[in-house]
């Protein structure tokens, strides 16, 4: 069957278009309002307090413990796991530190072999984690 033709077909064409719109991924994303239910609630970054440092086991076939931090977001109190990049950067993070969290790759999906981790740590106590790692800056005494 093709689309309806004729002078009286406008209502049918319009309603069909309206129902078919929901098959479009980007339309659905912008109109369902699910963006506000996610931890970041529509923003690109969020600040949080480190609750604990955790090690998450990598998925098969890899064998490693990926260093992460359990963080409670300040804006809404949600608890998330955030990956700590670079070798030894977990040493710059203490419990109760304020950290800046960003998304981690694949538009809300976990990246690579780290199951369930969708965010990464960018700053610790207002200082870039990369700057701390390269020893260009020091973490402020709190």
UniProtKB/Swiss-Prot annotation:
InterPro entries the UniProt entry points to: NA-bd_OB-fold, Ribosomal_uS12, Ribosomal_uS12_euk/arc
Designated name of the protein: Small ribosomal subunit protein uS12
Disulfide bonds: none
Modified residues (Hydroxyproline): 61
NCBIfam families from the UniProt entry: uS12_E_A (TIGR00982)
Keyword field: Hydroxylation, Ribonucleoprotein, Ribosomal protein
Disordered: annotated segments: 1-30
GO biological process, one term: translation
Keyword presence, Magnesium: no
Compositional bias ranges of the Basic and acidic residues kind: 21-30
GO molecular function: structural constituent of ribosome
Gene3D superfamilies the record matches: Nucleic acid-binding proteins
Basic residues composition-biased segments: 11-20
Parts of the chain that traverse the membrane: none
CDD domains in the record: Ribosomal_S23
Assigned protein family: Belongs to the universal ribosomal protein uS12 family.
A Gene Ontology cellular-component term: small ribosomal subunit
């Amino acid at each position: 069957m093709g689309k309806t033709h004729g002078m009286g077909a406008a209502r049918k064409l319009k309603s069909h278009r309206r129902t078919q719109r929901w098959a479009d991924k980007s339309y659905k994303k912008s109109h369902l309002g699910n963006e506000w239910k996610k931890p970041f609630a529509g923003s690109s970054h969020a600040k949080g307090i480190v609750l604990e440092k955790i090690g998450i086991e990598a998925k098969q076939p890899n064998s490693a413990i990926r260093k992460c931090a359990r963080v409670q977001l300040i804006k809404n109190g949600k608890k998330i796991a955030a990956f700590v990049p670079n070798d030894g950067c977990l040493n710059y993070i203490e419990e109760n530190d304020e950290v800046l969290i960003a998304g981690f790759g694949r538009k809300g999906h976990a990246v690579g072999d780290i199951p369930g981790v969708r965010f990464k740590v960018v700053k610790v106590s207002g200082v870039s984690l990369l700057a701390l790692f390269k020893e260009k800056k020091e973490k402020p005494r709190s």
